[in-house]
Amino acid sequence: MYSSYSPLQRRQLREQTYTDTQSTYLLVYAPGRRNALTLSLAEQLHRKFRLVDRLEGELTPSVNGVLLVSEDVECTSTALTYFAAALQQGADLVVCDAVFGYDGGSALYQTDQHLPGQRCALLSRALLDRCRATARGKDDVLELLRLANQLAQNCRCVPQALLHFRRELCAEDVFSAKGRRALILSHELTMTGAPIVLVSAVPVLRSLGFEVVVLGPADEGPLQLFLDAGAAVVTRPDCVTSSALWGLATSADLVLANTVVEAPVVNTLNGSFVPVLWWLHDAFAGYPFITHKIPRELGKNVHICAVGSHATAAMHSVRPDFEIEQLIYGLPDYAAEQFPRYDISFAGGRTLFVTVGSLEPRKGPDIFCNAIRLLPSAVREKAAFLFVGKAADKGMYNAVDSLVRDYPQTVFYRKRLERPEVKSLMEQCNCVVCASRDDPMPTFVTEGLIFGKPSIVSEHTGTAGLVTEGVDGFLYKDDDPQQLADKLAWAIEHPEMLAAMHDDCRRLYEQQFSNESYVATLTRLVKELTDGE
């Protein structure tokens, strides 16, 4: 059986631990086709179960729970163990993640807050009895699953892909029959700006009555953030280019397409009956590679919004007639949260400058490196500089690595930090630096503002249009390292004045990036699209 597991299932299986659940007696109720199910049940580590095709006469007093199976499915050898363990811990409805497709290339990650469309779930004996008493049909699996979703008092979603459906995933697997459906499309699920700020859309859509599903490629960090926000997540490596899962979009009441990379999907839905909100975060650099996929005209069902004037100008450079509204993302007030303190002892009490972003030409790490080198030695030694981001370009990484080796007591590099670490870093640093050559609205600069930290930004960033020079930040022009060095030198020599900018930085966050203004704007846009308001 192991050879038939998907890559995700194999990866998870290596980390699973065995739990003794043999005291829990289960029924597996599968009245339909069950060839694959029967074979996989033979490999179960949990052995105290019976496979039945009817419930009448099988529900003896010793049965603790019943796994309802509406269609043929393969289970991992640990499936019943996980289901039984959740039952022992007090759950009355237990579901799990699953993979779909012949090779298991599509994965469905579920959350306790989003449990419609179940095809397989474990019910406690008490919950099953209540569902059977309410059901109209005679032990119809889908009806029992629907009622269980309504009547359950303690749902539990096992975060393991225990099931493998050989067919492709469809809308009925992730949405309920009658709920309002919102599908969010993201070309990447990484700990970068666009996916991170996209998380904030989930609670807004849920507050408007939508069931929310996120579609993206393999998880590289923020998947759990979406789950915590109450969305289900579907991953597939080729989700942007493959039409296999676009059926989810045609069955939705709203599609939120994130970034210009989703142009192929927008093009497909353009002029259709599906309302599409296209949220642009993109810099100029990406447009030459995708312009040919952007519609030349937009149907009434497609509305475009952007995170500021820079992202707007980027789209207008190729489609000048498009109407684009402003939707500047909102970030929660992280300053009010509790998180572990990140160790910045390497700074030695000196003024700490931080930049966060992948090491690639567009992000300008070489400009920042050159500016640090241009500082007088006596000034440079009074500060510490931290680069955070993956090495996306060899030349840019070499520039940072060379600087670290030349000034090991002053310059530091971290490939990646977890979200709590980034928050703590922003709380403790003195200033953030964004040297990007092309950056619509850098998220880490906004995160700095939350903690009252001023920024030094390039004129080629969306933030540059919001910063007031010397009040809540600083601006330099022409990608000039010397200008940046001059701003750094002033900040290093005037730490008290830098710290005194705290209140103005907080004010800029509250005026431009607070969750309240973002929620109000997004709510209005969604209602205009879906309700005609």
Each model region followed by its residue ranges:
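Conserved donor NDP-sugar-binding/catalytic core segment of glycosyltransferases
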Residues: 78-106
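A conserved mid-protein helix/loop that constitutes part of the nucleotide-sugar donor-binding site
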Residues: 195-203, 360-374
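Glycosyltransferase donor-sugar binding loop
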Residues: 214-220, 384-398
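Nucleotide-activated donor-binding/catalytic signature segment of Leloir-type glycosyltransferases, i.e.
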Residues: 232, 398-417
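Aromatic "clamp/platform" in nucleotide-sugar-dependent glycosyltransferases that forms part
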Residues: 437
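Short hydrophobic beta-strand element within catalytic cores of glycosyltransferases
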Residues: 454-457
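Conserved acidic donor-binding segment of nucleotide-sugar-dependent glycosyltransferases
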Residues: 469-470, 474-481, 490-495
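A short, well-ordered alpha-helix in the C-terminal region of glycosyltransferases
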Residues: 483, 490, 497-512, 518-524
